Regions:
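Active-site neighborhood for divalent-cation/phosphate handling
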Residues: 71, 76-184, 294, 324-331
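Phosphate/pyrophosphate-binding loops at sites that engage ATP/ADP/AMP, CoA/4′-phosphopantetheine
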Residues: 58-71, 157, 240, 277-294
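Gly/Thr-rich phosphate-binding beta-strand-loop-beta motif of the actin/hexokinase/Hsp70
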Residues: 1-38, 70-77, 133, 181-230, ...
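Glycine-rich phosphate-binding/hydrolytic loop that grips phosphoryl groups
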Residues: 170-173, 228, 302, 320-340
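Glycine-rich phosphate-binding loop plus the immediately following alpha-helix
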Residues: 42-46, 145-173, 179-181, 215-258
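Non-catalytic, solvent-exposed interaction/assembly segments
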Residues: 1-107, 148-150, 156, 160, ...
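Adenine-nucleotide phosphate-binding core of ATP-dependent small-molecule kinases
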Residues: 224, 245-294, 301
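Glycine-rich phosphate-binding loops at beta-strand->alpha-helix junctions
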Residues: 290-320, 324-326
């Protein structure tokens, strides 16, 4: 049982285990510990033993860090669960839970006894005299068997998880807190004249999450492209082992022929731009009054030279690498190169 106000956030990724511990100091969130444990092989490599690699990483985490008496929050891929948003009719707030349960039966394609689910009224919802008028509700669910599967590595290692959250929603929460808090706290949401939206692209190892939000509303999509696709392109065209291709990708500018490396990866650059364009286009078809003003990109792959500029040039958007947090303190952690 956690006895402090500190929280560990843990992600079991395809390439590494990542963990960040934060605590509250008054109203300030302070990062006070961080760990990044890269696996000897990526979990998706054919010869890898994922369960063994993750178990070894968790043992290292426990040896190097104090996780007792802290809450543990685990992020899981967006495709592990379901997130849907709907606009309920005007209803008494005290009856909203019953309305949401009815909606859950319609929206969740499984028996509710087989899922873990919850809901949240989104910021900007209008509540007057005990009635929710103009509102939007987020509905979130995961199959119980999927929850058990995600928890299994930590259960086996004796790490007790207090909270599970799908990664795209965690990203939204970060944006809402770190960059849009003044808007959410001080502005009234107008569905006919919504505030500008931000796109955040989180590039993972085998897939990427794209989130579009104005702070009050959220739209998300998982894209079947990640950092490994660049590596595989090099493996295929340059006849390299996966390990050598990964090293070349990470050190492209120091290669014997950098131009050849980037030309080889260009098809994946183009595929990524196409996927982003398709996602933004679909979002705009559903939200005709939305105005997108910037694209933030995150993940280790964004360190690859030229990627951010290439995406921005082809999309016609201002692109920024998400390499800092406005409302997170703790220089001892924030200055660590592995964290950045």
């Amino acid at each position: 049982m956690a006895s402090s106000n500190g929280v560990w956030g843990i992600e079991i990724g395809q390439a590494a285990l990542k963990a960040l511990r934060c605590h509250l100091d008054g109203d300030t969130i302070v990062a006070d510990a961080f760990d990044y444990i890269e696996y000897p092989k990526m979990l998706s490599q054919p010869e890898a033993e994922p369960a063994e690699l993750v178990a070894e990483a968790l043992e290292k985490f426990k040896e190097r860090n104090d996780s007792r008496n802290f809450k543990i929050c685990m992020s899981v891929p967006g495709q592990s669960g379901l997130a849907k948003f709907f606009k309920p009719p005007p209803v008494e707030v005290k009856k909203l839970a019953d309305l949401v349960r009815y909606e859950a039966r319609q929206q969740i394609p499984f028996d509710l006894d087989d899922v873990v689910w919850d809901y949240q009224m989104m910021p900007g919802s209008t509540v007057e005299d005990g009635y929710a008028l103009e509102s939007e509700v987020g509905l979130f669910a995961m199959k119980r068997e999927m929850v058990a599967r995600q928890l299994q590595p930590l259960d086996r290692s004796g790490v007790e998880v207090d909270l599970i959250q799908m990664a795209p929603l965690a990203i939204y929460n970060m944006l809402a807190y770190d960059r849009m808090h003044e808007r959410i706290e001080n502005e009234t949401f107008n569905v006919d004249s919504p505030p500008t939206s931000t796109v955040l692209l989180s590039i993972g190892t085998d897939s990427s999450d794209l989130i579009i939000t104005n702070g009050f509303r959220i739209w998300q999509r998982s894209m079947p492209l990640g950092g490994n696709h660049f590596t595989r392109q090099l493996t295929k065209d340059l006849k390299l082992t996966f390990a050598k291709a990964e090293h070349l990708k990470r050190n492209a500018r120091e290669a014997v022929d950098p131009k050849l490396v980037f030309q080889t990866m260009r098809p994946v650059f183009n595929d990524m731009v196409t996927e982003i364009q398709r996602s933004i286009g679909f979002f705009r078809s559903l939200n005709k009054k939305a105005e997108i003003t910037e694209l933030l990109i995150a993940g280790n792959t964004v360190k690859m030279p030229g990627l951010a500029g290439y995406i921005g040039k082809n999309l016609g958007l201002e692109v920024h690498v998400l390499d800092r947090f406005n409302r997170l303190s703790g220089d001892d952690v924030l200055s660590v190169p592995a964290f950045r």
